[in-house]
């Protein structure tokens, strides 16, 4: 992973993967019921749109629709620079397709506000033929829409929660 990709993971605070069962003092975390929040189709449309913006360098548009807590933590320039570096690390793309949609409810978590989050994972084939993975993360806000919380490309797919 390029240095820029690593810094974006900190800069945009993607919705973290659920951890193994924790001690009783840990924050509440659960997979959301299928009917909670918007449909998986809506999440896929939003994630596809976010990837189109990433692919065309429209980082300001991504910033404009980011979750409020992301905007409070990071200025637009840092967001754009980190996002650009992360996307550049992926390189030229031959194809990509979604691999998983996971919704997660966070309550009392240290780094993110309480709420419903979602990760959309993609398997991406680079022009070289190598497969990498891209995660687009969102938070369902009070306006009823999913707002971007992060973009995280990586070379290996971790476990998919609930599978």
State what each model feature region is.
Residues 4-10:
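N-terminal signal peptide c-region/cleavage motif recognized by signal peptidases
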Residues 11-56:
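Short, low-complexity N-terminal intrinsically disordered segments enriched in polar/charged residues
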Residues 38, 44-45, 60-115:
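Short solvent-exposed beta->alpha transition segments
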Residues 59-60, 145:
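Internal amphipathic alpha-helical segments of the cytochrome P450 catalytic fold
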Residues 101-163:
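Exposed beta-sheet edge and beta->alpha loop/turn motif
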């Amino acid at each position: 992973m390029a240095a820029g990709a690593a810094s974006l993971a900190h800069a945009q605070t993607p919705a973290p993967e659920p951890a193994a069962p924790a001690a009783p003092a840990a924050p509440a975390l659960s997979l959301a019921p299928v009917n909670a929040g918007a449909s998986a189709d809506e999440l896929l449309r939003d994630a596809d749109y976010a990837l189109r913006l990433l692919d065309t360098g429209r980082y300001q548009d991504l910033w404009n629709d980011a979750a409020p807590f992301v905007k409070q933590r990071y200025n637009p320039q840092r967001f754009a620079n980190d996002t650009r570096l992360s996307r550049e690390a992926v390189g030229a793309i031959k194809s990509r397709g979604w691999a998983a949609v996971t919704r997660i409810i966070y309550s009392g978590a240290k780094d993110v506000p309480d709420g419903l989050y979602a990760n959309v994972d993609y398997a991406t084939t680079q022009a070289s033929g190598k497969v990498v993975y891209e995660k687009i993360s969102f938070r369902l806000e009070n306006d009823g829409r999913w707002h971007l919380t992060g973009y995280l490309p990586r070379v290996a797919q971790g476990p998919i929660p609930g599978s």
